């Protein structure tokens, strides 16, 4: 167990979780009642198996913890809780945090600098979040810090490090890699044309395959209308991997909303 040199608050395991309130966020509104029930069951197991640790004065409560657990379990709704094996703690800062980052250049020199991070997924360790950005994960904007870090964990199940290719059948690897790199190139072309700030997909997706998979996983669950029509082949691969189709959920929800409005006239 990691020992941290500052006082931390851990969420207790005997909470009466406010699931109805926790589900009441735009990210989860399109789930069916059956999906919500299964998501709650997974989230309860998640909270039994993982420690949520609040750092640097941040305070956890039952609603925050329940929402964090629900979002953690959304990507593995159809995969199973065992896909989140391999870590035991979620560390939560109140805001983006500073870490020492090291890298090796082309001639073998090691450089170090302090950088600000929103979150991290360690290969053999915890997921680290910050609450400021986690709150922005509740909407349907395409940004979701929790799903981003979970995607890295799912990616790392396929090897020692994140590669952008999760654990999929070997016969599908070449096609996945081709479609992922095509998406990266397309995103980079848009960045070159309009700039990072105006790009319709987070520019971080163009940096490397692992980040592309993580960023597009954010869009897959929280903004499918931006992902599916732009990269239809890759979208289908994501649907096959996650065994979910958020775009279909969106269409069904919209149709039910239209029907409800017509019934009121």
From Swiss-Prot:
Its cofactor is Zn(2+). The keyword Hydrolase applies. Binds 1 zinc ion per subunit. It holds the Pfam family Peptidase_M90. Involved in the modulation of the activity of the glucose-phosphotransferase system (glucose-PTS). Interacts with the transcriptional repressor Mlc, preventing its interaction with DNA and leading to the modulation of expression of genes regulated by Mlc, including ptsG, which encodes the PTS system glucose-specific EIICB component. Shows zinc-dependent metallopeptidase activity. Belongs to the MtfA family. This is Mlc titration factor A.
